Each structure stands twice: as C-alpha cells, then as structure tokens.
Amino acid sequence: QSCNDLLTENVVSRIGNDYINTAKGLNDATSAAYSSMRSWYGTERGMNLSIFGTDSYTNGADGSWKFMNTYTTDFDTRNGSISELWNDFYLGINTCNAIIERSAKVTGLSDAIKKQRVAEAKFIRAHHYFILTQLFGGVDLRLTETVAPTKDVKRSTVAAQYAQIIKDLSEAIPDLEAKSKSADFGRVTRPAAEHLLGKVYLYDNKFVDSANVLETLISST
C-alpha cells in the first residue's frame, strides 16, 4: 500500500552549490582547499614524484612502485600517484577559484577575513600550479570556477603559469597574517608565501627578484 502523502526528504549528505556563498561555507571551502595538500605532503606519491631518481630516496627490494625510479613504460597516466595528485590538485584549484570569485558577495564576515580567505586561496592555487608546472610543464591554467563537467581543455605555457603564480603570491602576501594564531593554527602566513615566491622566482630564473624576496624574509624573521 502506498503512502498517502508525498515524502519530502531533507538531504544532508550533499552540499548545495550555494553553500559557499555563506560565511560558514566560505570558511569551510577554504579548509577544503587546504585538504588538497594532503596528496603531496607526507605521502608516498609526494616522495615518489619529487625525489625519486636522486641520492636522497630510492626504492627497496620489494614494492609495486619500483618502476617510478627506473622510468619504465609502466610510468604513465594510469599510475595512481599521478592521477590522484592531478585530480586532487585540480579539485583544490577549483575550490580556490570559487573562493576568489564568490567572496565579495558573502555576508556575515568582515572584509579583513574575506581578504584573508582570498589570499589563502591564491596561495594554495599558486602552490598547486607550481608543483604541476614542475611535474608536467604546460598544464590547463584554470582561473575561474568550473561548475559543470567539461572536455574543454587548453594547455598553457610554462611562462604563463609562472607569471600567474607570481601574481597570485604577490597579491596574497599583503593580506596574510604575519604569524599563525594559536587559536587558528595551520593557516598560511605571510612568511610562507614569501618563501614560496622566492622559490618560484628561483625556478623562473629571476635570481635578483628571488634574492630580494628571500633576503627580506630572512631579515624579518
């Protein structure tokens, strides 16, 4: 026997697209963007993709990832370390794009906090594109939020990517806190962004700019 009334479900397992437009949603989105760094730091894939092939790190006698150290034909896009990092970083980048685009219309947060969240998003986006540039060269440089599946992909250039990374970090630095607050520990700080900017300049062969940023950082800490 069927029910007499229409069942209206209160779905709590999914977050609507408008949630990020709220004060709590913007803060939660920023936390979600940070979580995408888990694919790189303190993980096997981060080690495999960064220092395999050097004297610092090598494979053992056993294990299924030895080919990443010897660059065999098994080292391709089907590799879990590559696909997981790629997917997680682009999810993080898209979240950052949403934060940057939507923050201005969010109510219930002070302008200072909104500026800080945008600065954090720009740092994370710059960080991810820097790692992707090191690993893959030119990639799809997405700077706006993607809200629907798309097959429209365009490969950018390393020069354009470095220019955007430098722009993001330069814009983020003034709005980041000088040091972490004990009550809100773990957020990116101004010195962290300055350190990354100095490193990016170094990789982009802008040695004078790198020295200037890093010397200022050293003298201020």
Q: Which residues are covered by each model-predicted region?
A:
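Short linear capping/connector segments at secondary-structure termini
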Residues: 12-16, 73-76, 143-150
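Conserved, well-structured interaction surfaces
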Residues: 23, 27-31, 35-39, 63-136, ...
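TPR/Sel1-like alpha-solenoid repeat signature
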Residues: 122, 194-201
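TPR/TPR-like (Sel1-like) alpha-helical repeat modules
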Residues: 214-219
